[in-house]
């Protein structure tokens, strides 16, 4: 019985336990680092590794504390699960870079985890946005269809715009999902090329594999970010309660800065700014470039951890009536069934999505009947009435700015269903706004 009560009150002791474990890790890690500095002649490499370790010890507790708070207040799984996955990016990046800085010979293999998780983060951010929207607006496709046509941004402004509705929604999701496939695939190719000694990381030359993989990864990443930006532009008003701009910048800056600074460092090697004259304890100039990249990432992740603490805060999810066990919250963090389901859905619809053929368009694109016309066809009214009868999801309520945002249906949907009900009862209401277009 006492054991059961202890586990039920896990929210009270889990945070002090985490603090104690972190302090113990510092007690063990700091003497080992000092001993490492004393046993060898201190050089630039060792100093850089020690400084990066200091930033690592500052970064890890900030990120893990926010993750732990989300687990303690795990009240909205569909929103907090992708947030927790995004928050893990900072500890993974920081620890990976610190290990790679210490052991340059295995950097290519350790960095594989970082590069794969980068794509995973972008996918989960898209999942966070779509989960919020579909829970608050069960008829999300109808909302997008009712909006004005969104044109492409430069440099794709000459391309035909994506049809508003299901086509745009699935193409944006597919554009993000493709990066989660391309990035791990190119990472595996990089490992194979490294084993075959044809990778030559950091050397811009069309005779090696690294240059081609950088181009492929860059194009795939840019398109994924473009789809995210287009998705936000279309649904900017609906996403405003969760303040997505700060979250988008946190994800975008970490991913883009880490990628492009690697390209800039490689260019510095190419033009001779980083040369063989100053390799310090590193064996090659390419190893110097990789070490510099890892050192900078360790510093940047400290800043990213602070930014994540505020932009992905746990406070909107704190509720008085909290249920669930410690193990349920912890295991839910590693559950990837939602990713499997999403990939299956995209595979089933990929043909129709690419070709631009939605299953059904509730708002027909006609010159006499468009989104500015106040009369809907009978078939559109029927579709809207059916859609409005679907109960909203009970999860996904985001408590921000002192109130709880509850699931809603579109105003058009609600009005259409009300009009249908009034007609059936034989009651006609006078129009309260503009006269009906003939």
From Swiss-Prot:
Where located? Membrane
InterPro entries recorded: Ostalpha/TMEM184C
Give the compositionally biased regions (Low complexity): 374-390, 404-413
Bilayer-crossing residues are 17-37, 48-68, 86-106, 176-196, 212-232, 254-274, 287-307
Membrane topology type: Multi-pass membrane protein
Instruction: Provide the GO MF annotations for this entry.
Output: transmembrane transporter activity
List cellular component terms (GO).
membrane
- Could you list the residue ranges forming a coiled coil in this record? none
Which N-terminal stretch is annotated as signal sequence? none
Regions of biased composition (Basic and acidic residues) lie at 426-438
Note whether Transmembrane occurs among the keywords: yes
Q: What does this protein do?
A: Possible tumor suppressor which may play a role in cell growth.
Q: Which family does it belong to?
A: Belongs to the TMEM184 family.
Name of the protein this chain belongs to:
Transmembrane protein 184C
């Amino acid at each position: 019985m006492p054991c059961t009560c202890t586990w039920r009150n896990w929210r009270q002791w889990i945070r002090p336990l985490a603090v104690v474990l972190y302090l113990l890790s510092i007690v063990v890690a700091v003497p080992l680092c000092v001993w490492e500095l004393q046993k060898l002649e201190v050089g630039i490499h060792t100093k850089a590794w020690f400084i990066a370790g200091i930033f690592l010890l500052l970064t890890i507790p900030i990120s893990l504390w926010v993750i732990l708070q989300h687990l303690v207040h795990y009240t909205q799984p569909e929103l907090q699960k992708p947030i927790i996955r995004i928050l893990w990016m900072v500890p993974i990046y920081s620890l990976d870079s610190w290990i790679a800085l210490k052991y340059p010979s295995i950097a290519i293999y350790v960095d594989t985890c970082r590069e794969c998780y980068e794509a995973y983060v972008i996918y989960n951010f898209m999942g966070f946005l779509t989960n919020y929207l579909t829970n608050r607006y069960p008829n999300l496709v109808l909302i997008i269809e009712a909006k004005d046509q969104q044109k492409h941004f430069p440099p794709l402004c000459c391309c035909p715009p994506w049809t508003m509705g299901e086509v745009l929604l699935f193409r944006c999701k597919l554009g993000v999902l493709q990066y989660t496939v391309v990035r791990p695939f190119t990472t595996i190719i990089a490992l194979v090329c490294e084993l075959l000694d044809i990778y030559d990381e950091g050397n811009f030359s069309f005779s090696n594999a690294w240059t081609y993989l950088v181009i492929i990864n860059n194009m795939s990443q840019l398109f994924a970010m473009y789809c995210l930006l287009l998705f936000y532009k279309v649904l900017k008003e609906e996403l405003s309660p969760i303040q997505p701009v700060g979250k988008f910048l946190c994800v975008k800056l970490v991913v883009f800065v880490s990628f492009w600074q690697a390209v800039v460092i490689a260019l510095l090697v190419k033009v001779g700014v980083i040369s063989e004259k100053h390799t310090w304890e590193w064996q090659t100039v390419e190893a110097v470039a990789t070490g510099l990249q890892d050192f900078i990432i360790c510093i940047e992740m400290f800043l990213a951890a602070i930014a994540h603490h505020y932009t992905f805060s746990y406070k909107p999810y704190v509720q008085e009536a909290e249920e669930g066990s410690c193990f349920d919250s912890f295991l839910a963090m590693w559950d990837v069934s939602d990713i499997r389901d999403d990939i299956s859905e995209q595979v089933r619809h990929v043909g129709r999505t690419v070709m631009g053929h939605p299953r059904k368009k509730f708002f027909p694109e006609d010159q006499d009947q468009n989104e500015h016309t106040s009369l809907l066809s009978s078939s559109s009214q029927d579709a809207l009435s059916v859609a409005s009868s679907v109960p909203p999801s009970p999860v996904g309520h985001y408590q921000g700015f002192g109130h709880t945002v509850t699931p809603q249906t579109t105003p058009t949907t609600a009005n259409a269903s009300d009009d249908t009900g009034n007609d059936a009862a034989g009651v006609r209401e006078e129009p309260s706004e503009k006269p009906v277009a003939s």
